[in-house]
Amino acid sequence: MSFKGTTVIAIKKNGKTVVAADGQVTFGHTVLKSNAIKIRKLLNGKILAGFAGSTSDAITLFEKFEEKIKAKGDGLIDIKRAAVDLAKDWRSDKILHKLEAMMLVADSNNILLISGTGDVVEPEEDVISIGSGGNYAYSAALAYMENKKLSAFEVALRSLKIAARVCIYTNSNIVLEEIENE
């Protein structure tokens, strides 16, 4: 799956987790909006989520993801279990299967990529990125992560700025959300 029109990155560093995205929305070769918000706080700010792809599909998936977490009913938040459950439904459900988006979700301990092909990926490094500029942002973030002085916020911001310079579907109107790690 390849989605043009965005870059989303998740980073965990020095006790903080950040999810950030650019604001560009494109339709074909036209920029429709430059300040869209593609990240959300879920469960009263305990989980961060970002998406690449169709906005309405992503909102549906955010809602389904929250339902999966709440379905446990024990008050514990297990984003890994919820991600696997969502990926299974997304792949097998006739309606969900048609949704075109990818998601990054993060809590204070985990960063995950969830796709409609049934993939749930926990990155080897504390960095993962999706969207048309994802590879550029990911590469930049890996390099910036080596700088001990940079925070997760700064790594995400700088990495997305690099992606915006290289990817025509990514801009530098960046929105970042951050949570403290436990």
UniProtKB/Swiss-Prot annotation:
Top EC class of this enzyme: hydrolase
Pfam families: Proteasome (PF00227)
Major location (coarse): cytoplasm
InterPro entries linked to this entry: ATP-dep_Prtase_HsIV_su, Ntn_hydrolases_N, Proteasome_sua/b, Proteasome_suB-type
A single BP term in Gene Ontology: proteolysis involved in protein catabolic process
Protein location: Cytoplasm
GO MF: metal ion binding; threonine-type endopeptidase activity
Regulation: Allosterically activated by HslU binding.
Enzymatic reactions: ATP-dependent cleavage of peptide bonds with broad specificity
This protein's UniProt keywords: Allosteric enzyme, Cytoplasm, Hydrolase, Metal-binding, Protease, Sodium, Threonine protease
Residues annotated as binding Na(+): 164, 167, 170
EC number(s) on file: 3.4.25.2
GO CC annotations, alphabetized: HslUV protease complex; proteasome core complex
PROSITE patterns: PROTEASOME_BETA_2
Active-site annotation: 6
Family membership: Belongs to the peptidase T1B family. HslV subfamily.
Subunit details: A double ring-shaped homohexamer of HslV is capped on each side by a ring-shaped HslU homohexamer. The assembly of the HslU/HslV complex is dependent on binding of ATP.
General function of this protein: Protease subunit of a proteasome-like degradation complex believed to be a general protein degrading machinery.
PANTHER family: ATP-DEPENDENT PROTEASE SUBUNIT HSLV, METALLOPROTEASE TLDD
Name this protein carries in UniProt: ATP-dependent protease subunit HslV
Lineage of the organism: Bacteria, Pseudomonadati, Spirochaetota, Spirochaetia, Spirochaetales
Gene name linked to the record: hslV
